[in-house]
Amino acid sequence: MKTTPVTFEDLQSSVIAVPPLCRNKNLSLAKSQNSRLIKHMHKGGIRTLLYGGNANLYNIAPSEYHSLLKMLVKISPEDMWIVPSVGPMYGTAMDQAKILREFAFPTAMLLPTLFPSKPAGVATAIRHFVEKSGMKAVLYIKDAAYITPELAAELVNDGLISWIKYAIVEPDPKKDPYLKKLIKLVDPKLIVSGIGEQPSIIHLRDFGVTGFTAGCVCIAPSRSTALLNAILKKDWATAEAIREEFVALEDLRNAHSPILVLHHAVELAGIAQTGPVLPLLTALPDKLLPKIEKAAKALLAKNA
């Protein structure tokens, strides 16, 4: 596992994959299957993994957190940067901060929640986490009510933030008042588009952010990598053509659950056995699985 400090070059050199977490039938961590998924992504050019919402870390038992981190360290290639998540609740994040001190992860992300939280309280939680863990935090902005651009900028200016995962969904990503304000207050080099391949072109081209996170990259890592490279080369026609390849699976994720569709898609495509879904979530209805399988396999076929 890569343990060097976070740099702009790191953020821009790889799509930041946000994978599901594979589990055995008894809900224990499936080391071999998680390793298999990581190898698939690594082969496709991915060098940064973010374990967060798609890994359903919202519902992980605090008693399992140390085992999760230990597993990720063991199965990750030496040149791969792993970003675990903490929280979303304050007490959970503080306990996880102590555990993180036992490892060499360069940064960790606080999972967002709107209830019960207030923007000033979120900022305080970030400060406490950084102090207790000894590492900078990834700030995940998923809703405008979570934290203000001004508070986010204060955290950045105080040297507490490694990077920002920006994921507020707008009907038209070109018209994004929050992001427009954020990039005036924070260096766009520290901001990563956090909504997958679909708005990545607009976010990088029009707002100047550094890179993007994605879930469907777990299916077709080489294609998502090609998309990032095309954007960085300003080859917009190629980038748009590649972006279209992800639409079918992304539409299913948006319609039925980004987390659950990806969880099923990885297994149905034959990449790795993701296993059962950890409660409070649950598996999608069987009637949806053929559509997910078709879209996942079609996308995987383009990855060759």
Can you annotate each of these PLM segments?
Residues H42, V73, R101, V130, ...:
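N-terminal cationic-hydrophobic initiation segments that often serve targeting/anchoring roles
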Residues D143-H256:
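Catalytic alpha/beta core domains of metabolic enzymes, predominantly
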Residues K2-I147:
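Active-site beta->alpha loop and helix N-cap motifs at the rims of alpha/beta catalytic domains
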Residues N34, Y65, L69, A93, ...:
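A general structural signal for well-ordered alpha-helical segments in protein cores
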Residues K2-V6, I16-L21, H40, G44-G45, ...:
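C-terminal alpha-helical cap/extension of soluble enzyme domains
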Residues I60-A61, P119-A120, P149, K175, ...:
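Short Asp/Glu-rich motifs
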Residues K74-M80, F103, S133-M135, D158-I161, ...:
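Short helix-capping segments at alpha-helix termini
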Residues T113, Y166, L278:
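Glycine-rich phosphate-binding "P-loop"
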